[in-house]
Amino acid sequence: DRICTGITSSNSPHVVKTATQGEVNVTGVIPLTTTPTKSHFANLKGTKTRGKLCPKCLNCTDLDVALGRPKCMGTIPSAKASILHEVKPVTSGCFPIMHDRTKIRQLPNLLRGYENIRLSTHNVINAETAPGGPYIVGTSGSCPNVTNGNGFFATMAWAVPKNNNNKTATNPLTVEVPFICTEGEDQITVWGFHSDDETQMVKLYGDSKPQKFTSSANGVTTHYVSQIGGFPNQAEDGGLPQSGRIVVDHMVQKSGKTGTITYQRGILLPQKVSCPSGRSKVIKGSFPLIGEADCLHEKYGALNKSKPYYTGAHAKAIGNCPIWVKTPLKLANGTKYRPPAKLLKER
């Protein structure tokens, strides 16, 4: 980084720091850094950028879409980059969900990390003939479908014993969850269970005791015990007040791997599954996405790379981004500065 002395001078010298000569006055510099200002977010240049999981699903949260809530069914566009836009807590409506008993709030962000996401065309399990049945598939007036009839989530079947003969207590039952996605895709299987007060538990299932549930897939095993009663009536989106609650969870199955669910009464059996593939970079941001940008930065929003480095807030960024540095960098493009009087004396 040696800088030589020139024979001409400048009235406005600049100071650069060098590794071998320390601070040096020079006749000219090129700034290498910029300090961004906060902006809106944008689509990332050269890639598809996804905001909401289902842009055409109006009045739906991303968790609604991930669970297949009626009226929230639609195509999830492919994307190499995804915006994590929802303010916590992430919730879904329809039937009252005990969101904090499981990791279900993480499901939308798990899906965002995939480039391609599709819902299976058929159910992974025949719920009506599953162990412990025969069952009827329950629906709720709190979960209206597209014709405003009673409905439920597309990813789960509410397995209610069909007749009095099997509305009885049962020992734990096990059902295998096959892998039905195609090679190269993962399978994200949603399941859960319903519980209510003692009176409703006896009416629906013939057993008022807490029920046990276990899921196992990809080396991960999770255990739950249902809570009986103690729930205040809760209505979702203008639906009927519900004395019961559902607990919803998900498991990730890798290609060709079978999962298992062990359950008692009140099971919400898996139905449609998500089949995601590829990878999408995820960054926290906000809507709307306006125009295009070289880089998306969690603190500054959309950035266009005018300089190779930037100063200011250091945060996650994706795309063709400048590199963060603590202090401004300059490139000397002139000679070492000497005052005019000293130059004349040396001559």
UniProtKB/Swiss-Prot annotation:
GO terms for biological process: fusion of virus membrane with host endosome membrane; fusion of virus membrane with host plasma membrane; symbiont entry into host cell; virion attachment to host cell. Keywords: Disulfide bond, Fusion of virus membrane with host endosomal membrane, Fusion of virus membrane with host membrane, Glycoprotein, Hemagglutinin, Host cell membrane, Host membrane, Host-virus interaction, Lipoprotein, Membrane, Palmitate, Transmembrane, Viral attachment to host cell, Viral envelope protein, Viral penetration into host cytoplasm, Virion, Virus entry into host cell. It is found in: Virion membrane; Host apical cell membrane. GO terms for molecular function: host cell surface receptor binding. One of its GO terms (cellular component) is host cell plasma membrane. Glycans are attached at residues 25, 59, 145, 166, 304, 333. The keyword Disulfide bond applies. It is a single-pass type I membrane protein. Homotrimer of disulfide-linked HA1-HA2. Binds to sialic acid-containing receptors on the cell surface, bringing about the attachment of the virus particle to the cell. Plays a major role in the determination of host range restriction and virulence. Class I viral fusion protein. Responsible for penetration of the virus into the cell cytoplasm by mediating the fusion of the membrane of the endocytosed virus particle with the endosomal membrane. Low pH in endosomes induce an irreversible conformational change in HA2, releasing the fusion hydrophobic peptide. Several trimers are required to form a competent fusion pore. Major glycoprotein, comprises over 80% of the envelope proteins present in virus particle. This is Hemagglutinin. The gene is HA.
